[in-house]
Curated annotation (Swiss-Prot):
Homodimer. During catalysis, the active site Cys acts as a nucleophile attacking the alpha-carbonyl group of tRNA-bound glutamate with the formation of a thioester intermediate between enzyme and glutamate, and the concomitant release of tRNA(Glu). The thioester intermediate is finally reduced by direct hydride transfer from NADPH, to form the product GSA. Possesses an unusual extended V-shaped dimeric structure with each monomer consisting of three distinct domains arranged along a curved 'spinal' alpha-helix. The N-terminal catalytic domain specifically recognizes the glutamate moiety of the substrate. The second domain is the NADPH-binding domain, and the third C-terminal domain is responsible for dimerization. Belongs to the glutamyl-tRNA reductase family. Keywords: NADP, Oxidoreductase, Porphyrin biosynthesis. NCBIfam families: hemA. This is Glutamyl-tRNA reductase. It catalyses: (S)-4-amino-5-oxopentanoate + tRNA(Glu) + NADP(+) = L-glutamyl-tRNA(Glu) + NADPH + H(+). The keyword Oxidoreductase applies. GO terms for molecular function: glutamyl-tRNA reductase activity; NADP binding.
C-alpha cells in the first residue's frame, strides 16, 4: 500500500496561486469524488484546504502523483508545469512525516498553532462523507492526531506564539495611538473572524460592526461582542465609517473593490484606513494596497509578525520532531504489516476449509457409532497430514536449491522450541 501527498502552502506558492486551489468545506466532498473518478484505481483520498495550504492525501496500491497533479492543475485552471514549480509531492514515510508535522503545527505560519488540527478533523469528516476514507488514511490521520496531542502536551511548541488575530491587533496598535477610539468592521462570521473579534474586543474599541451575507450568523457573533450587524450589500455605502476593516469570507471573488475604498477615503477626508484581508482567495482587491492612505495586510504580510517568537522555541521544535519521527516509524510498521493481511486471510480460509472437512468426516463416523477415541485420533491425523502436506512436498523436490530453501523455512516455522 502506497501513501502519497500533493500540496501547496504559504512557503511554496504566492497568495493568488493558493487562491485558485482554495476549497470551501462544502466543496470538499464533490471535489474528492471528482478526483477519485479521474484516477484509475479509485484510491483513498482526503483534501485539506486552509488559507495557508491545500493538500491532497491519497492511499492506494500504486502512487498516481502525476495524474493527481495534472487533475489539480486543471481544476485550478493553471498549467501542470506551473503547479509543479510551486507544489511538493511526498510518498510513504515522507508523506506520513508531513501529515504529522502539519497536525502538530510544525509546518504552520504560526508555529505550534492549534487551529490546523480542527481543520484536519473537518477534512477527515468530509472524506468519510464522500466515501473516500479507508483504513490506511484513517490510520494516518488518527495517528497524526495522537502525535499532535503528544507534541502539545510534552513540549512548549505553542508557548509565546502570536496568532494571526493577535498579529492584526498588534499592527493596528502601531497605526492608531488609541484603539479605544477606533471603529472596527469585521466582514464575515467564521472562525477566523471570531478569533479576530475576540482579540480586538479586548482592546475596547469605540465601535464594532459585523457585515455578513447571512444576518442570522452575523447576529450570533455580534451578540457576543455587543456589535452592530449589517448586510454585506450595505458595505460599500458604509465603509467610510470604519477606521479598521478585517475581512475573511469564503467568497471566490473580491467583495471590497478599489472603487469602494477610494470613495470611502474621500468621505473620510483622507483619514487612514487599516485593512486586513485574511481570506484566500482575496476579499479585498490587491489594487487597494497602492492607495496612499490605506494600510492593507494579507495573510502573507502577517508572516513576519507571527514568527517573531519562533527562534526562542527551537528546543521545543527539536523535541516535537523526535515525537513525529517515532510516530512515522510506528505508522510505516503498521503499513508494512498490512501487506501481509491478504496472505493471512488466505491462510485462515485454507485452515478453516481443512478443519471443516475433517470435522464433517468425524461427525459421520460418530453417527455410525464409531469409537470416540478412534474418531478423535483420525481427526487429529487428518488435520496434521493436511497441514504438513505442502511442506513434505517441498522437502521432496528434485531441485537442490529449492529443497534447501524449504528446509530452512520449515525449520524456522515448524521446529521452533516453545518459549
Amino acid at each position: 500500500m502506497a501513501v502519497w501527498t500533493l500540496g501547496i502552502n504559504h512557503t511554496t506558492a504566492p497568495l493568488d496561486l493558493r487562491g485558485r486551489f482554495a476549497f470551501a468545506l462544502d466543496q470538499v466532498e464533490p471535489t474528492l469524488r471528482a478526483l477519485r473518478g479521474s484516477l484509475s484505481r479509485q484510491p483513498e483520498a482526503a483534501l485539506i484546504s486552509t488559507c495557508n495550504r491545500t493538500e491532497i492525501y491519497c492511499a492506494g496500491e500504486k502512487p498516481e502523483l502525476e495524474h493527481t497533479l495534472d487533475w489539480l492543475a486543471q481544476t485550478g485552471g493553471v498549467s501542470s508545469s506551473l503547479l509543479r514549480t510551486h507544489s511538493y509531492t511526498l510518498q510513504d514515510d515522507l508523506a506520513a512525516r508531513h501529515a504529522f508535522r502539519v497536525a502538530s503545527g510544525l509546518d504552520s505560519m504560526v508555529l505550534g498553532e492549534t487551529q490546523i488540527l480542527g481543520q484536519i478533523k473537518n477534512a477527515v469528516r468530509a472524506a468519510e462523507a464522500a466515501g473516500a476514507l479507508g483504513n490506511t488514511l484513517s490510520q494516518l490521520f488518527q495517528r497524526s492526531f495522537a502525535v499532535a496531542k503528544e507534541v502539545r502536551s510534552s513540549t512548549e511548541i505553542g508557548a509565546h506564539s502570536i496568532s494571526m488575530a493577535a498579529a492584526a491587533v498588534r499592527l493596528a496598535g502601531q497605526l492608531f495611538e488609541d484603539l479605544g477610539q477606533v471603529k472596527i468592521l469585521f466582514v464575515g462570521a467564521g472562525e477566523m473572524i471570531e478569533l479576530c473579534a475576540t482579540h480586538f474586543a479586548a482592546k475596547s474599541p469605540k465601535a464594532i460592526a459585523i457585515a455578513n451575507r447571512s444576518l442570522e450568523n452575523g447576529e450570533k457573533l455580534a451578540s457576543r461582542f455587543g456589535a452592530e450587524v449589517m448586510r454585506l450589500a450595505d458595505l460599500p455605502d458604509r465603509l467610510h465609517e470604519f477606521d479598521a476593516v478585517v475581512s475573511c469570507t469564503a467568497s471566490t471573488l473580491p467583495i471590497i473593490g478599489l472603487g469602494a475604498v477610494e470613495r470611502a477615503l474621500k468621505r473620510r477626508k483622507r483619514r487612514p484606513m487599516f485593512m486586513v484581508d485574511l481570506a484566500v482567495p482575496r476579499d479585498i482587491e490587491i489594487e487597494v494596497k497602492a492607495l496612499e492612505d490605506v494600510y492593507l495586510y494579507t495573510v502573507d504580510d502577517l508572516a513576519s509578525v507571527v514568527q517573531t517568537a519562533q527562534a526562542s522555541r527551537q528546543a521545543a521544535v527539536a523535541q516535537a520532531e523526535a515525537i513525529v519521527d517515532a510516530g512515522v516509524l510506528s505508522f510505516m510498521h503498521w503499513v508494512d504489516q498490512r501487506g501481509s493481511v491478504p496472505l493471512i486471510q488466505q491462510l485462515n480460509a485454507q485452515a478453516d476449509e481443512w478443519r471443516a472437512a475433517e470435522l464433517a468426516r468425524a461427525r459421520k463416523l460418530l453417527a455410525k457409532g464409531e469409537d470416540v477415541e478412534a474418531v478423535l485420533e483420525a481427526l487429529s491425523k487428518g488435520l496434521t497430514q493436511k497441514m504438513l502436506h505442502g511442506a513434505m512436498t517441498e522437502l521432496r523436490a528434485s531441485d537442490t536449491a529449492a529443497r534447501e530453501r524449504a528446509s530452512a523455512a520449515i525449520q524456522h516455522f515448524f521446529l521452533r522450541k516453545e518459549r
